[in-house]
A protein has these predicted regions:
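Cyclophilin-like peptidyl-prolyl cis-trans isomerases
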Residues: 1-167
């Protein structure tokens, strides 16, 4: 397990990454953290009673029409391991994707228990592997979640990810 500190314009969030149980997904996130990839990006999609989404490189400019469409230039394989069935519970960090094997840099933090996003639930086409959990700063997550949003669930007041680093 590895912890990262996400400094945001709303405050700090500490996340425990499941590097032992989810080595592909958590390892990819950690590799991007170590490169400074997430520094200066914004939460580009916030839905109260659901989640906060970030990690799109186009969100460096939070007014870009392309927010939510970017990747690091590659995608990773879905990590669906029988011994790592972490549910999309409150405070968990999950891989955003647009279909099978399409995850890259975008992630979301669940603000409610979204079990319908669990990869092993065959009744839904969604498959979002959990690879970490907020261990400090859920009050900051809730603060960001409560922001006013406009079209496409984009915050009207920018919610910046100042930096993410190993802690």
């Amino acid at each position: 397990m590895t912890n990262v500190l996400m400094q945001t314009s709303a405050g700090d969030i500490t996340i425990e990454l499941y590097t032992d149980s989810m080595p592909i997904t958590a390892g990819n996130f950690l590799k991007l953290v170590e490169k400074g990839y997430y520094n200066g990006l914004h939460f580009h999609r916030v839905i109260k009673g659901f989640m906060l989404q970030g990690g799109c490189p186009h969100s460096k400019d939070p007014n870009s029409n392309r927010c939510g469409t970017g990747s690091p230039g590659y995608s990773i394989s879905d990590e669906h391991l029988d011994n790592a069935k972490f549910s999309n519970e409150i405070g968990t960090l999950s891989m955003a994707n647009s279909g099978p094997n399409s995850g890259g840099s975008q992630f979301f933090i669940n603000t409610v228990h979204n079990s319908f996003l669990d990869w092993w639930d065959k009744s839904t086409p969604s498959a979002h592997p959990v690879f970490g959990k907020v261990i400090d700063g859920m009050d900051i997550v809730k603060k960001i979640e409560s922001c006013t949003t406009g079209p496409n669930d984009k915050p009207t007041k920018h919610q910046k990810i100042i930096s993410v680093k190993k802690s």
